[in-house]
Amino acid sequence: PGGSSGGEAAAIASGQSAFGIGTDIGGSIRIPAHFCGIAGLKPTVDRWSNRGSATGIPGQELVRAQMGPMARTVADLDLLMRAVDPQLACLGDPAVPPLPYLGLDKVEVAGLRVGLFVDDGFLSANPALQRAVRRAGELLTQAGATVVEFTPPEPELMYTWLAGISADGGVTLERSLGSDAVVRQLKDTVRIARMPGPVKAVVGKLLGARGEQRLAKLFAVLGQKPVAEYWALTDRRTQLRRREFDAWNDLGLDAVICPPHSMPAMPLGTSGDLTLSLSYAFRYVMLNFPAGVVPVTRVRDDEEVRAKTTDRLERRAAASEQGATGLPVGVQVVGRPYREDLVLALMAAIERGARGDALYPATPTEPM
């Protein structure tokens, strides 16, 4: 559940697997960790070698997938990070920087400055996720960190991700599918990819006229692009990354905590209608910041309700959250590039504090 590494997350959470390795290009380590109540880490791209790892879109470099560890505890993530030596990996992969991983125990949480946000300005997070992030902020404050409110720049950043990932017009997707039947979750994506440009433009305008601005823009950005437009997207990605750095520097931030997703785990078969709910996860793979997820709490029965709205995406999110009481809720911890040690140290501090809470989503088996 939650992404391409969802099977591994479910196996870890249920005690069938001690740990696992996932890949993340849009949240496929972090979202399954959040949905299943385990811990996961998406390192900086090429912190671990990606040589030998298959990618869904070979040659697409605007947004890159990265392998990373998944486990029941943050200590296990730290162990896995220690087990992979970049100074050896770089001998077989020139993309890997020879920077040693120092370990979370070398990081002093007290004195760190952490930004916090519960709404990315694109899609509001479920009340349970907002509560979890606030609780994580309290726990880090108790550990000696300074936690301040942070407003992330460019709330519609995910459209750049979608524009880049679809720049081949769906050719790679079509080739991969071959004659296979399309699963329900991919049907809308395939339908839009196959839609002629003029038809897509008309549909987008109609959606915009009905007030569905987010879906209208989705239709506008998806599809084949000439090289010059792809280069412009790549430059925009770089500028967005610099803006994020500047925003962190303005506040003197060492890290940020925020929701990993806009909602808890969704019912089977509904994810295809909720692609835009991934904005919190897309953000930090697009910007190439290391990011991890640590379990904090569970959904309360008064947190299944969103404010009433006419927006289609918000309505779909609200419908999928019905019956979510008791589901695990994680918090995303983001650090500066190559500071996986700092990310895990903050995750460990949150984990230590949250374990004493009544709603902590403990996995059914003890760590191995």
Where are these regions (language model features)?
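Glycine/Thr-rich phosphate-binding loops of Rossmann-like dinucleotide-binding domains
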Residues: I29-R30, S124, S262-P267
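Short pre-catalytic strand/loop immediately N-terminal to key active-site residues, enriched for Gly-Thr
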Residues: P1-G3
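Amphipathic alpha-helical segments in well-structured domains
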Residues: I38, Q130-R134, S166, L276-A281, ...
